[in-house]
Amino acid sequence: MNLSATIILAFAMSMDAFAASIGKGATLYKPRFREALRTGLIFGVIEAITPLIGWCIGLFASQYIMEWDHWIAFSLLFILGCRMIFEGMKQRVAETEKMRSHSFWVLVTTAIATSLDAMAIGVGLAFLQVDIVHTAMAIGLATMIMATLGMLIGRYIGPLLGKRAEIIGGIVLIGIGFNILYEHMHLTA
């Protein structure tokens, strides 16, 4: 795979993380650049690791994992999305009571859920002549950049939307989950 194809793949793989991080940024009380960078790093590292895992799986057991990856991603995103919607529907909270940061595990779970498609890509890359390490690094870097930008964009969208931002963020996560299911069903049909 040439450099331009790798860059296009990397940024395409980062779009789920970008959308999810906009929702995450919108639900925080004035997230700082440090929080945005932390989110970007978590998403980027996980998004870089998953194609490597997928590549290894592709070498050994692709038919088994491909049957379930979309259901795992959908379930995680659906649960997280429902949780965000539920929190957004609770009694309105003053701006000063909004969270200052998301927990590490919430970010990791969201990052894993949005990166399972990168694992599936890694499975496919196992059958091509690619430098998987450089490709995974490009995917991780693009995701880090896009997730950081998403958090910063969410910072400015959040005050405009108030608590609705959390509901919208939850809907976005559920939508990403349904999109993963749709793409899988469409590809297997």
UniProtKB/Swiss-Prot annotation:
Location in the cell: Cell inner membrane
GO molecular function: manganese ion transmembrane transporter activity
Membrane topology, record value: Multi-pass membrane protein
Pfam families linked to this entry: Mntp
Gene Ontology CC terms, in alphabetical order: plasma membrane
Key words, A-Z: Cell inner membrane, Cell membrane, Ion transport, Manganese, Membrane, Transmembrane, Transmembrane helix, Transport
Keyword check for Transmembrane helix: yes
GO biological process: intracellular manganese ion homeostasis; manganese ion export across plasma membrane
Chain segments annotated as transmembrane: 3-23, 41-61, 65-85, 104-124, 132-152, 167-187
PANTHER family: MANGANESE EFFLUX PUMP MNTP-RELATED (PTHR35529:SF1)
Function field: Probably functions as a manganese efflux pump.
Family under the similarity heading: Belongs to the MntP (TC 9.B.29) family.
Protein's UniProt name: Putative manganese efflux pump MntP
Originating organism: Yersinia pestis
